[in-house]
Amino acid sequence: MKKNPSRNVHFSKGPSKLLDKINVSIDVDQRLFKEDIAGSIAHAKMLGKQKIITKRDSEKLVSGLRSIQTDIKRNKVKFSRKLEDIHMNIESLLFKKVGKVAEKLHTARSRNDQVVTDLKLWIKNNSIELDKELKIFQKTLINVSKKNVYTIMPGYTHLQVAQPITLAHHLLAYIEMIGRDRSRLKDCLYRLDENPLGSAALAGTSYPIDRLYTTKELGFREPTKNAMDSV
């Protein structure tokens, strides 16, 4: 039986088929491919800028990652369940593109800060898109309300007819509800807008990284202040 290094210390036997099935997340997290690649590109560029790796290796990594992103968008990539998640899949693809240089991408980076960065970017990007859709929905309700200022309908309370109201009054109530939801999204985006990349596995790294650089590259407002809190 081929041993898994991550399990050697505590387990003498391999995992059950059920556990392997549970651990496979590629069916879900493949949607993170753009964010995972964006984080890796920013990190690779920073490693080159800081001379932690050579400029040539940095450029090779960036080129390989961009090529992978293009392949995925063109549906040329079939993700492997054997590689469990999007991170391992992209790393495997990168190794095929650029060879052993791919191993340098994890210099000064852990899977911990990588995953948190991916998730923050994904939620941030999708929250922005969701807010745009909610704004369109509000405008649609307002337009319908303007046409129904004098349209009478029954108003209900406790599942019983209570008062005559207008359709406009009813629809405009949803404008307020959606407005509160958009305010929550705005607050969520503010809290998300901190870059955890560089926190590494737990308490940062001894490499001379530049977190302000990756923060700007990824479009975050600022880097997180405490590595342990970040991951």
Go through each PLM region and give its residues:
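Short, intrinsically disordered, charge-balanced linker/junction segments flanking boundaries
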Residues: 224-231
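A helix-coil-helix interface module used to build multimeric assemblies
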Residues: 2-204, 208-217, 221-223
